[in-house]
Amino acid sequence: MIEISNLTKIYGSGPQEVMALKEVSLSIRKGEIFGIIGLSGAGKSTLIRCINMLERPTQGTIMVDGQDVGSLNSLELRRLRQKIGMIFQHFNLLSSRTVFENVMFPLEIAAVPKNEAAQKVNALLELVGLTDKAQVYPEQLSGGQKQRVGIARALANDPKVLLSDEATSALDPQTTRSILGLLKDINRKLGLTIVLITHDMNVIKDACDRVAVIDDSTIVEVGDVLNTFSNPGTPTSRSFINSIINREIPAEILHRQVIDHGSNSSRLIRVSFIGPSAGEPIISSMVQKYAIAANILYGNIDQVKDIPFGNLTLELIGPVNTINEALDFLRKCGLEIEVLNHAGN
């Protein structure tokens, strides 16, 4: 649906030159919710604004639904933009117009007949849950309701793509969840491709199918959201994930002095699990089968798209050979094992 190749955006020149994007390449599939996360100034908003040419890239190509966006003339670009809706952190509603009239506005610009446009607006207000607010003015709405109006307005021309630039960052957590739920519902009902810019990993976890992590103007990781959460591949990804799920083992546990257990060995391990294995008594089965002790020191669990994932830090106590056999058993059960430290006789 969207193919971005070697995209670079430079502002200014000479000593004032700033590289906002550096050789960015992405492939966004039709019908998915694709998240782009990064810190302030990383380049994520510049990237999304290049997709509909609100920002012209310095070099590189952007293909949207088979069209090279950068090669379009003014008329062609205007037509393409009608098929790319956009919502923002600030709602940009017209204060002198009612909710109905705000949603009607892009249809007026497109010269859609009034009766047809009115039917369209009513359907959109029903979709976003604002039928009873049609004749209300923006100042009478909550932040979440204003964003719902913005979403309805962005959908007025039946876009194929919806761009969301920090659309929930000004909202409280409960309202954010409500708006994300609406976007997922729209994605499911309309088959709409959604590109979602955020600095909040909770937004990625709750709404997205795949995610790209941008750091210092460059894409550093792209992947399925579940895989990124369960096995982040870069320090930037780990930092974002740790902001909502602490995957890092506390130092006092990691550097724990292994206790002398006489003739037995002691080994500190981290066990990572994902999907069905999270609900199975694998650790209990290991303890019973190999007659070793397992001391649970630390752990956490969470869900992405109703799939559980997490990790446990365990101290295993027993004969060296038996512990090795137990670790092989865990691996055969599909668990990822990391040995943190060990001691033994």
UniProtKB/Swiss-Prot annotation:
Keywords: Amino-acid transport, ATP-binding, Cell membrane, Membrane, Nucleotide-binding, Translocase, Transport
Domain ABC transporter, residue spans: 2-241
Keyword field contains Oxidoreductase: no
Catalysed conversion reaction: L-methionine(out) + ATP + H2O = L-methionine(in) + ADP + phosphate + H(+); D-methionine(out) + ATP + H2O = D-methionine(in) + ADP + phosphate + H(+)
Cell compartments where the protein resides: Cell membrane
Keyword Membrane: yes
SUPFAM superfamilies: ACT-like (SSF55021), P-loop containing nucleoside triphosphate hydrolases (SSF52540)
Domain of life: Bacteria
InterPro entries (UniProt xref): AAA+_ATPase, ABC_transporter-like_ATP-bd, ABC_transporter-like_CS, ACT-like_dom_sf, MetN_ABC, MetN_ABC_transporter-like, NIL_domain, P-loop_NTPase
Matching Pfam families: ABC_tran, NIL
Membrane topology (UniProt): Peripheral membrane protein
Function: Part of the ABC transporter complex MetNIQ involved in methionine import. Responsible for energy coupling to the transport system.
Assembly description: The complex is composed of two ATP-binding proteins (MetN), two transmembrane proteins (MetI) and a solute-binding protein (MetQ).
Record family assignment: Belongs to the ABC transporter superfamily. Methionine importer (TC 3.A.1.24) family.
Protein name: Methionine import ATP-binding protein MetN
Organism listed in the record: Syntrophomonas wolfei subsp. wolfei (strain DSM 2245B / Goettingen)
Gene that this sequence comes from: metN
